[in-house]
Amino acid sequence: MVKEFLKKISEGKHLNFEEAREIVLSIDREEITEAQLGAILLGLRLKGENPEEIAGFVDVLHEKAKKVPNKTPAIDVCGTGGDKSNTFNISTAVAFTLASLGIKVAKHGNRAMSSKAGSIDVIEALGFKCSDNPEEIAKDIDDKGIGIIFAPYFHPVVGKAVKVRRELGIGTIFNMAGPMLNPANLSGQILGVYSEKVMHRMAEASLILKKDNILFYHGKDDGIDEISLSGKTVFAYLKNSKIDYFEFSPEDIGVKRYQREDFNGGDAQENAKILENIFKGRAKEAHIDIVAVNSAFALWVLGKVKEVKEGFDMVKDHIMKGKVYEYIETLRGKTA
């Protein structure tokens, strides 16, 4: 079976949904050699992973994941990474900002792969630990407003492919599947993607899987997996079994355009310091504005605001008053 799939991929043909599922099941059953897996991942990358293949991978990986049983549906804010942009951890800042506004957040993340600091590295640098207990994380979401989901604890099948992926040293279909695998009960998701082409494929894969209320985006002018304030952002919004495509520029909501370099980050400690300053409302305006605009789109996806501009103004005011930092200190147990 695996050899048949390899032959098909080597001829530049796409796998169908069931064939893609079968590859992941073979990884789980350990019926595929490292050489075969490496060849399949590279072959898919060279011909270009199509929506059915992505959907097949996601379907099994999510099926096999340990689930987080939060009672109140939550939102996830994450990105594919792989944009080589060295921005600070914007989606992590957005996650805590949303939680401080009373929005339930299930932050699904990992350590750094290609960047200097992954979301989990920064969350730990902020003083928070990651639990491997699904019930504990669900309780954090329901009671505290945010739960941190460290991906490797919850996706055993992904773990079986880590060695091959590391040796390949390139982005593979797993990089697209990863952000689509949040094991919590979700009400919506905003998901940054490193390429516009891949964004379209991921949106179409989610449609195949009958997912709903996911906003995919890509910073078109600067190539980042965030909603950009230094250029145009393109979107694919999956809602009610339909994908809508649209664009956004900072000027649309009266925000000035910044330089791409204004959002540069560093290692986990440096990025944690940037986030602390944002939470206190004492950061550079560029940092506060990009967190506010990404948060505003999340509020829009959840139906909490009618217009992104309304959300932006509300979030920026909230940040400037130090409300996010007050919430962070409560999570740390430093205030009543």
Curated annotation (Swiss-Prot):
GO terms for cellular component: cytosol. It comes from the Bacteria. It catalyses: N-(5-phospho-beta-D-ribosyl)anthranilate + diphosphate = 5-phospho-alpha-D-ribose 1-diphosphate + anthranilate. Pathway: Amino-acid biosynthesis; L-tryptophan biosynthesis; L-tryptophan from chorismate: step 2/5. Its EC number is 2.4.2.18. One of its GO terms (molecular function) is anthranilate phosphoribosyltransferase activity. 5-phospho-alpha-D-ribose 1-diphosphate binds at residues 79, 82-83, 87, 89-92, 107-115, 119. Anthranilate 1 binds at residues 79, 110. It holds the Pfam family Glycos_transf_3. Mg(2+) 2 binds at residues 225-226. Catalyzes the transfer of the phosphoribosyl group of 5-phosphorylribose-1-pyrophosphate (PRPP) to anthranilate to yield N-(5'-phosphoribosyl)-anthranilate (PRA). This is Anthranilate phosphoribosyltransferase. It comes from Dictyoglomus turgidum (strain DSM 6724 / Z-1310). The lineage of its organism: Bacteria, Pseudomonadati, Dictyoglomota, Dictyoglomia, Dictyoglomales. The gene is trpD.
